[in-house]
Amino acid sequence: MSKEDLIEMQGKVEEVLPDSRFRVTLDNGHQLIAYAGGKMRKHRIRVLAGDRVSLELSPYDLNKGRLTFRHIEGRGPRAPQRGAR
């Protein structure tokens, strides 16, 4: 599956679960289980209950997601990513 096939959404972390998983409520009200993406683990980005996050969903399973960005209050949305080098 290519990166273009993923659905990008935003939501709020409701609960921190074991094994670096999180219960997230999307802006449209849908709840799902998400895990921290590889770069978030690598850079030890801490995600707490109540944080606003961006996540990617597979079009094949809308009940699981991958956290890709933690939004910090007072900072604007992240810049769009450039293509691969």
Swiss-Prot record:
Record bears the keyword RNA-binding: yes
Coiled coil: none
GO molecular function: ribosome binding; rRNA binding; translation initiation factor activity
Primary location group: cytoplasm
InterPro entries, A to Z: NA-bd_OB-fold, RNA-binding_domain_S1_IF1, TIF_IF1
Recorded family membership: Belongs to the IF-1 family.
Protein name: Translation initiation factor IF-1 1
Organism name: Paracidovorax citrulli (strain AAC00-1) (Acidovorax citrulli)
